[in-house]
Amino acid sequence: WCSTCLDLECGASRECYDPCFKAFGRAHGKCMNNKCRCYT
């Protein structure tokens, strides 16, 4: 687990962009182990 990971199931990295933007203000992230990891 990491501080920039979201407990959100994903199937593709693009599914993480909007949640990452809402959570951290940047629409950058990737799908790792079916969870979103955001880049900040």
Swiss-Prot record:
Pfam families: Toxin_2 (PF00451). The keyword Secreted applies. One of its GO terms (molecular function) is toxin activity. One of its GO terms (cellular component) is extracellular region. Its main location: secreted. InterPro entries: Scorpion_toxin-like_sf, Scorpion_toxinS_K_inh. It is found in: Secreted. The record marks 30 as: Basic residue of the functional dyad. Disulfide bonds join 2-5, 10-31, 16-36, 20-38. Expressed by the venom gland. The record marks 39 as: Aromatic residue of the functional dyad. Keywords: Calcium-activated potassium channel impairing toxin, Disulfide bond, Ion channel impairing toxin, Neurotoxin, Potassium channel impairing toxin, Secreted, Toxin. It comes from the Eukaryota. Belongs to the short scorpion toxin superfamily. Potassium channel inhibitor family. Alpha-KTx 12 subfamily. Inhibits high conductance calcium-activated potassium channels (KCNMA). Inhibits Shaker B potassium channels. Has the structural arrangement of an alpha-helix connected to antiparallel beta-sheets by disulfide bonds (CS-alpha/beta). This is Potassium channel toxin alpha-KTx 12.3.
